[in-house]
Amino acid sequence: MSKIRRKVTVENTKTISESTSRRPSVFERLGPSTGSTTETQCRNWLKTGSCLYGNTCRFIHGPSPRGKGYSSNYRRSPERPTGDLRERMKNKRQDVDSESQKRNTEEPSSPVRKESSRGRHRDKEDIKIVKERTPESEEENVEWETNRDDSDNGDINYDYVHELSLEMKRQKIQRELMKLEQENMDKREEIIIQKEVSPEVVRSKLSPSPSLRKSSKSPKRKSSPKASSAGKKERKAAVVASPLLDQQRNSKGNQSKKKGPRTPSPPPPILEDIILGKKYKEKYKVKDRIEEKPRDGKDRGRDFEKQREKRDKPRSSSPGQHHSPLSSRHHSSSSQSGSSIQRHSPSPRRKRTPSPSYQRTLTPSLRRSASPYPTHCLSSPQRKQSPPRHRSPMREKGRHDHERTSQSHDRRHERREETRGKRDREKDTREERESEHDHRDDREPRDSRDRRDTRDRRELRDSRDMRDSREMRDYSRDAKESRDPRDSRSARDVHDYRDREARDAHARDVRDARDARDARDARDIRDVRDVRDVRDVRDVRDVRDVRDVRDVRDARDVRDVRDARDVRDVRDVRDGHRKEDVYQEEARSYGRNHLREESSRVELRNDSRNESRSEIRNDRMGRSRGRGPELPEKGSRGTRGSQMDSHSSGSNYHDSWETRSSYPERDRYPERDTRDPARDSSFERRHGERDRRDNRERDQRPSSPIRHQGRSEELERDERREERRIDRVDERRDDRVRDRDRDREREREREREREREREKERERELERERAREREREREKERERERERERDQRDRDHDREREREREREREKEREREREERERERERERERERERERERERERERERERERAREREKERERQREWEDKDKGRDDRREKREDIHVREDRIPRDSHEERKSKKRYRNEGSPSPRQSPKRRREHSPDSDTYHSGDDKNEKHRLLSQVVRPQESRSLSPSHLTEDRQGRWKEEDRKSERKESSRRYEEQELKEKLSCGDRQREQAESVDSSRVRAQDLLSHRQAEDRDRDGSDRAHDEKKKAKAPKKPVKKKKEEDVGVERGNLETHEDSQVFSPKKGQKKKNIEKKRKRSKGDSDVSDEEAAPQNKKKRGPRTPPLAIKEELADISTDKDGVLEDPLKKENTAFSDWSDEDVPDRTEGLEAEHTAATATPGSTPSPLSSLLPPPPPVAAASTAATALASSAVSATTSATSSSSAATSNTNGSEDSHRKCHRARGEKVEVSHVTLEDTPHRKLVDQKRSSSLGSNRSHRSHTSGRLRSPSNDSAHRSGDDQGSRKRVLHSGSRDREKTKSLEITGERKSRIDQLKRGEPSRSTSSDRQDSRSHSSRRSSPESDRQVHSRSGSFDSRDRLQERDRYEHDRERERDRRDPRQREWDREAEKEWPRTRDRDRLRERDRDRDRRRDLDRERERLISDPMERDRERERTFETSQLESGKRSEVKLESEHERDLEGSSRDSVALDKERMDRDLGSVQGFEDVSKAERTESLEGDDESKLDDAHSLGSGAGEGYEPISDDELDEILAGDAEKREDQQEEEKMPDPLDVIDVDWSGLMPKHPKEPREPGAALLKFTPGAVLLRVGISKKLAGSELFTKVKETCQQLVEKPKDADSLFEHELGALNMAALLRKEERASLLSDLGPCCKALCFRRDSAIRKQLVKNEKGTVKQAYTNTPMVDNELLRLSLRLFKKKATCHAPGQEKTEDGKLGPCSIQQELCVS
């Protein structure tokens, strides 16, 4: 409490309270000597904005000073005009000590009652708020005492804790003062009498203060010292406690309501309070009950106060305000009811413990125990002295209040009597009298209470005046203590004020009614009484603290000893403050005795304080106890109590403690307990009395009826208001007396404070010593701990190192094992490669036959396409695309690229741009014939290839991939669907051709059919990969797809351009979209009617539509996912049909079925046959599949990669999963259905159709999948599945996750390469030729190519996948492989992009197993080999897409190198072997088709050639349409691809689990040696010629002969003969070089502006300017061309400056320096120039 606040006497308070310019502080509002309250904002004002007291209100009605200055500001803010709260409180203490001795004699019961009721409230609140004030928290008081030392020293906690404690004390005092005012109004006459009784009052106040403190500390004291009044107090506790409890609960509720945040009472006291609250809650509940018995003893005083307050409530509402103003004070002060109570009680507790100043005051406060501060002070000393005493402020009220109250109170009364003699005896007498009197007063008419209140107020004023004078004397002490008690108080007031501002807004709204009514009366009463009470309470408390000190000194009670210790600690902590607090405590005890009518009032106040503390404890704990009247505070304190409990740290103090005194007291408590516990206790008591009065007043208005006198509080409030008004006048009179008394009391208080502070200093020293000892112990312990940890760490490190070494050894062993495995794998792979070579030879023969059939099929397809073109006006563009396709697949590929770029650029939605582009672009018409090329086959292959070429070409793939691939995905999906329809038509046409092919393949095709029946995947694999018998034509469409895939990896651009221009024209052509969809629907209807059920066709359409709908990016992702997943999913479909089956089961049933359905639909569609399929396919699938595809594309792009990869059959999240599962299921069903459904002819036909679809759709899909990367669209999936499913189903069956990935890349590669081979051969590919022709015409006819695509891709992929699944089911070996590989494939599908090489290795290992299975069945083997190579091709394509994304050249080189590897067989890396095997498989498939077995060598060569062609088409086809591939080329390509694929299949069959390490990733890299890089420019600088050139040639050094040679050479090389002459102008080579450089620099000025020369940077601009300004000769201008080593100008200036300095220093040196400087600068200039 800074002296400024202390300066405020009761008169100042009156003046201040009368002046509306400032808001009356808590002290002003609370009591006469509320100079401190001057800056305490009126809670009524804060709450309601209006105060009934008006100018007389002791509290500030302006902006809350506390809100402003919560901490140190608040110290002064509460009593701004008067001075620090501490000073005011000291003055008040002194005044109250003198006055309260007088008054307490005269009006001990009313002020004491107010104090004690406040003290009870505070104690209750302290106890309640400091719910956890357990012995631990009491022990915390020691820490708080230490903190008190800090607080005395103005520690960090000072502002918060000290001000909290100050605020809490102030508010308690204010409540008490309000009670006292109310009582003083009754008791002003009695106050005078009590002033006579002042020694007794001091003693009784001291005793009641100890009772309050001790009672608050221990209900025992309350009981025992007030045993006489114990019955009264118990009655009163019963009476008052129930109202108090009600008020406490009300105040708790109100405070909880009003102050969500309590004013942060010192958190450390909260710990004590929490500890107390924990132990004390139970104890306190018991003790509160007991206390309420002692409180009934105390509450007799308190209940006298309360009854008087009840009586006075009409008059002064002071008794209620004892409780209610306690609550109100706590509310208003702390949280304006509970907050101040809490601040007072819990905060004091906490602050007593935490705030040394508080503990200085704590002893007084504890004795006052109305103020939690003393409780804390005592608590920490009590902890030292007797933990119960610490508790007793809060807990001891619960615990020891009975014991201590009786014992300590009696002993304190005795000691105070001994100490103070008359006053103590009078105070004991008064306390007893006042407890009786309070009971009486409660029973007494308000007049007697008013007299007592008046006396209390007068005594309070006098004691406060004395205290104020003391406080002014204590100013210096208060300078210390001002931080602690005053600052605690001011912090309390600030906190209370802030909380009050928060609460005051609420609490004043609530209490403004009360405060307006009661506060003015109660403030008059309170201000008189509260100032007296605060001062008297403070003085009484200080006197009590002194007496407690004396009682402690008497050591009758260990608690008294502890109190003394606390007092001593408080005094030690606050030696100066202790004296002040002693004075203040004496004044307070005196004033309290006066205020409490010594015994009764002090007992009542101590009881009320102790009970308030216990109530505060209870309130703080839970406010469940002893405070009926403090229900608002209980609410606030309930919040505060809980928040205090939570606020052990004090975080919620402010929140919970809305009353400033509670929060600041709490905040101050830690510091007061730490610093000025005694003074803080005194302050707490003073403030607590005021705060209690305030809270009682306010609470008594709303709360006191609620709490204790809630029934009569309304009347009593009004009466109290009137009485307060009277009492204010009386208080003003009393203030003068009180000022004198206060001066006396302050002197006594200061003496006591000095004593207390000495005690506290001693205690603190002991504490510090103990703390140092503990710290040393802790340090030693920490050192030991650190040592242990270091040892442990070292041991752990050693163990870790051992483990690391072990792991390294394990890794070495693993690596060796893996090396051995890899060697074995390579051996197995080589055998498989040989096996595949043989297979490829067979395949090539079959491929040649198939190629011939494909030629026929292509012819039919072209006819179909012509029909389709004729049918579709949109397809006229597509017909142009067909022409262009026929002419140049590369052009269509370019078109596809451009259109895919289109899409990327223009069409985020796959449908619109793909449709439009399909419609408008050759791609759309001819399925990716960007130039509207009429050759839809070429366009399809081109479109497909551009996908791969884009995949191959990183820029195209990356840039255009999403857009173009999306477009192409849509286009290829639509084109695929249209191709599927076309393929269906073609397959209808080709069904004969396919059947013929398959009959031609019948050797293999019989196997294939048997295997197709077993598993259509095998049939498709045979058709497509395994035997490529039906596939051979398809594989010239489809195996070309696979070689196309491979070559698309290699020649992705070209072959994809060619084959996938067909396929992708179908698949991607956006323009075809609608007509494609319709035509595909019609075709699917027709074909679905013929071959596939409408359901199949419809799901196909749905699936196609699904992808069409999905965004391009999604579609492309899905397409790539499809590619990966098609390959993978075809493996899974073979294994699990987990491939992305977006289509319904019937869509998927068989690709063959779907293809046949497509054929039928395509055939019907060309004829515009609206079969049920078209009706079924187009409408439902577009919706389902469109949404599904859109969702699936989006989700399958994400989840299809994951879900489909993880479980292809598991519904790729949303549609993708459903597509996958549908496709799988549909494939399985469809395959089963088609196996059963499709005849052997149909099976071949389906194979052809599937192969066509697979080739067109598969390559489209592969391309799309490739192109789209992971964009998976059902169309792409079905495209992949249709094309890839045949080969990739084999792969799916035969390859695991790696096969999946290979299926993705191989299907892509296989389908695309087979298509590319077909395109290269000139066949559009079976599916490409027939399906593409059909698809082109169909897709052009199909209004929605997406639906066609979906139909094609879905039906194709589903059919082939279902067949594959059927085959898998039939072939348990393949099922096993599928099971092995499918999960892996799914895993690898997820990881395929990342780990496809690994997947390939694993697929190879799996494929080795599969090869064994295939070797069991040569057809199976062939199909597997083909599928594996195709998968590998697809994987290669993926690899190549990855690598092609890096560079198309790489993929070309890779494909070439793969072919070379296959040819060489030496450089068969796992990946290379996979690719080679894929190529060889494709080659063998194609070679099977290509009847010419002699072409095996050709196909190996042709693989290289076709790969070269593919690479060329990739390179050129990326930008150009792919050139049509002749059948011979295709056969060679297919043969080479098949051989390489066989080799790769062998390797893939070998794939026993290979690690990424095992994978020879070099296969991804082009085999051709890197071009020798020219040495870097940096190295060129150091060639001899360059060095000499830089140096320049000097005639002298080089010699005339050499120089002549050089000159001649230079002249020859120089362009302008003129320049040659000037080359060697100078003798020195360096000068020549410099001149030459200048010329070059000048010449390059405006020409060589660097890479980023859109704008001239300043550097370049300035350089140019410098160069242009320069002379050729290198004059000074030239110095700026190159940054001069020396800035000549700067040098000159610096030299001049140096010279000047040197001249100044040594004028003689100037000349030499000038002389030196001149030459230096000149020389340097010359050098620089």
From Swiss-Prot:
UniProt keyword Nucleus present: yes
Reported function: Associated component of the WMM complex, a complex that mediates N6-methyladenosine (m6A) methylation of RNAs, a modification that plays a role in the efficiency of mRNA splicing and RNA processing. Acts as a key regulator of m6A methylation by promoting m6A methylation of mRNAs at the 3'-UTR. Controls embryonic stem cells (ESCs) pluripotency via its role in m6A methylation. In the WMM complex, anchors component of the MACOM subcomplex in the nucleus. Also required for bridging WTAP to the RNA-binding component RBM15 (RBM15 or RBM15B).
Region (Disordered): 1-40, 57-156, 182-528, 581-1527
GO molecular function, one term: zinc ion binding
Pfam families on file: zf-CCCH
The keyword Ribosomal protein belongs to this UniProt entry's keyword annotation: no
Regions of compositional bias (Basic and acidic residues) in chain numbering: 76-136, 182-193, 283-315, 393-528, 581-636, 655-701, 710-897, 920-938, 957-1035, 1047-1065, 1114-1137, 1149-1159, 1228-1253, 1278-1288, 1296-1351, 1359-1440, 1447-1482, 1490-1499
Family: Belongs to the ZC3H13 family.
Composition-biased stretches (Basic residues): 214-224, 1036-1046, 1072-1086
Zinc finger motifs (C3H1-type), residue ranges: 36-64
High-level lineage: Eukaryota, Metazoa, Chordata, Craniata, Vertebrata
Phosphoserine, modified sites: 64, 77, 198, 207, 209, 211, 242, 265, 316, 318, 324, 327, 369, 371, 380, 704, 907, 909, 913, 921, 924, 929, 949, 951, 953, 1069, 1086, 1090, 1093, 1256, 1259, 1273, 1275, 1295, 1427, 1443, 1447, 1467, 1470, 1499, 1526
Keywords noted in UniProt: Coiled coil, Developmental protein, Isopeptide bond, Metal-binding, mRNA processing, mRNA splicing, Nucleus, Phosphoprotein, Repeat, Ubl conjugation, Zinc, Zinc-finger
Localization per record: Nucleus speckle; Nucleus, Nucleoplasm
Domain of life: Eukaryota
Disulfide bonds: none
Cross-linked residues, Glycyl lysine isopeptide (Lys-Gly) (interchain with G-Cter in SUMO2): K179
Annotated protein name in UniProt: Zinc finger CCCH domain-containing protein 13
